[in-house]
């Protein structure tokens, strides 16, 4: 008798950054900008591949990329994929003042709402670099999950607040009990893969 195949679950997500990450680092000359344009070349191929295999996934997109490539972003939505928040202009929140971070977060939410008809529930920080205020802001704006941290390979976990990082002694971990915010790579209800 052949052994039954195990059901395996994989999470596939994409960051459609285009040139935003390069521009956010001050790389605005023609060469890095052209390198960033390749995302727009690859995206239709990725959408076709996902369609071919019946895969629904999540695309994390900065607001400026939605403004730069509206038709491609509309194609993502039309194909039934989730659009997650990936900053306004791909500037890492850790490099922003708290009010700048909140302004970019709110602006990105509104742009995604215009694109999809609803506020995003998922967030992936530009350059995977959260600020000390990021978790508080994500909770304030009703996010369900964030997808920037990497403390576990496949199990969702609660995001902590209040970590204290020291260079001269051990790390002090903050508290995750009150956040309710998950760090996961997919939305459980949408993909039926992770039950929390």
For each of these PLM feature ranges, what is it?
Residues 2-122, 127-196:
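Catalytic alpha-helical scaffold of carbohydrate-active enzymes acting on polysaccharides/glycoconjugates
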């Amino acid at each position: 008798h052949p052994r039954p195949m195990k059901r395996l679950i994989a999470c596939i997500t994409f960051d459609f950054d285009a040139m935003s990450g390069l521009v956010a680092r001050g790389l605005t000359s023609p060469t890095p900008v052209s390198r960033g344009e390749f995302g727009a070349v690859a995206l239709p191929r990725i959408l076709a591949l996902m369609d071919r295999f019946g895969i629904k996934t999540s695309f994390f997109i900065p607001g400026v990329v939605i403004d730069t490539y509206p038709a491609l972003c509309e194609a993502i939505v039309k194909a039934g994929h989730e659009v997650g928040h990936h900053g306004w202009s791909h500037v890492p929140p850790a490099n922003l003042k708290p009010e700048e971070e909140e302004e970019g977060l709110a602006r990105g939410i509104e742009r995604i709402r215009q694109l999809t008809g609803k506020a995003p529930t998922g967030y992936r920080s530009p350059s995977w670099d959260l600020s000390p205020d990021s978790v508080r802001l994500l909770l304030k704006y009703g996010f369900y999950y964030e997808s920037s941290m990497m403390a576990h390979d496949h199990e969702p976990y609660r995001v902590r607040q209040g970590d204290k990082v020291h260079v001269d002694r051990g790390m002090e971990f903050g508290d995750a009990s009150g956040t309710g915010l998950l760090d996961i790579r997919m939305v459980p209800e949408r993909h039926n893969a992770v039950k929390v």
